[in-house]
Structure formats: C-alpha cells, structure tokens
Amino acid sequence: MFSVGSYVVYGSQGVCCISEIRREDFSGTAKDYYILTPSDDPKMVIYVPTDAATLTSQMRQLLSLDELTALIHDGAAAEPMEWINDPRSRNEQFRQILQSGDRLRLFCLLRAIHERREQQIALGKKLYAVDEAICQRAEKLLHGEIAAVLNIKPDEVQSYIQSQLLAEG
C-alpha cells in the first residue's frame, strides 16, 4: 500500500504524487481510491481504485539513488539497440517499450534515438516526426523520474547523466 504524499511512477503517465486516499462512489459501489496528481500537470487528477490489482501494479516506487546510478551505468554498458528500418515495426517496438515502463529499455531506446538523430543530422536529414514524438514521451517518463529522484528540473537530467558517465571514465 502506498502512502499519501509519496511519489510514484504511474504507467505511461509519469511521476505522480499521491495527494490523498479517499472513498468515492462512482458506480453505485463505494471504493477507496488513490488520488494521483501528475507532477507535470497539477490540474489533472487520476483516480486509481486501491483494490484494482491491474491498475495498482502500474504504480511503482521511484528509483533510489543507488538504483539510479546502476541504471545509468547499465544503460551505458548495454548493447546498443538495433535500429529497425521499417517505420511501422520500429514504431510498434518503441510503443511496447514505452508501455512496459522498463527503465533500462527506456534508457536504451533514448540512446538509440539520440544516436540515430546524430546520424541523420550528419546526413543533413531529420528524424521522422513519430520518432521525435516517441523520444519526447520516453524522456518525459525517464527524465521525469530521474528529476524527481534528484530534485532537479527534467531539462537538467541529460547533463547529469553525461556528468555521471564522464566521472566513470
């Protein structure tokens, strides 16, 4: 069970604060709900029934500092993701990674997209718009969580990761 005031990552929504746990009657039956407020959209409210295992399983604790350090190290050391040339197949694989919420796979996805972007720039080209959109969603998820763990802004995460990798040598 999660507690009021704690932060979680909720599915593909990203970092949310559990603002309260309260009883609501939406469908004729009163239930307890986690009331989540996304960090990047404080006007939005998400209701998650406390007894709905399929939904509460999408709520994950934020990384610890040790887990974050390991993620950065493991992500940098991981085999590069092979770029799929067929846009439909690539988009499907990228969406599966986003939906999984797997932090290491998200890290590798971002690494692959950033590398591809650099290759395209060198050729005087741009990434497909759908790849840019996937990159933005993945950054929102992963950078949002890292920013929450470190208490920094999401746009400072990339330089933090680079400094950690340089420090490792």
Where do the language-model regions lie?
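Charge/polar-rich, low-complexity and marginally structured segments
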Residues: A53-G169
